[in-house]
Amino acid sequence: ACASCHVLASATADGAALETRLDVSQEWLPEVPARNVPDLWNRDHNDVSTMLWDGRLQPVAASDQVGLVLPESLSATVFENLMALQSVRPIVIPAEMLGEPGAANALAPEARGAPIPEGVLARVVSRLFEVDARGQAEGESYRALFRESYGIGVADEVRPAHLGNALAHYIEIAFQSRDTPWDRYLAGDLSALSADQKRGALLFHGIGGCAVCYAGDIFSDFGFHSVGVPDIRENKDLGRFYATGMAEDRFLFRTPPLRNATL
């Protein structure tokens, strides 16, 4: 379940002081060091131009290309946005939800770097339409919802993009903050912020220089920066380098959005 890692009690992050490794063997762990789970708040916002701490999931920037970049062999077509793509990625990653290959997991790829079998997401779709021992559809409510939302109601018509788009719409509705004291203040309600909060805003947007990086509606430029703090761990996290392979991107990380940071 998504909520196993995106914990509601921790504002959809993991709430951990230190990152933890997933329970798979070393062979199937990615080269990227363990990281804390990113939260889901306001990820539908138009300012969100990348996903994950190193921006591995992003729109194609080249002018002669269209679509979205994925590090896995998963087609980006018909997914509505980055959040829709990211919603299904954990399902096809061995170190997250897919698991290691074995007798009980025939859907996992045979080796690291091998293409993800297309049957993985097809199997997820089919589970929504399976019948129980009495011949009754266990996912009847899902069938009704897919029929209502997309005009489809049988497994053969449901595509992985339908799953991703549905999850993204839920995240958009469930985890958004559009009516905060800050929003009301910007809209003209000068009483929405306390005197201390106003002084903090002046510092944040003024001499403190915070807004140089923490800018926009959700307080992030979504750029990649190094704050100069050394990584003391044995397995150092090279950040943006894992997405681009460029030496100059070593130790750069995406600016985390500060909207709702106190949750």
Task: State the predicted function of each range.
Residues 1-263:
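Periplasmic c-type cytochrome electron-transfer domains
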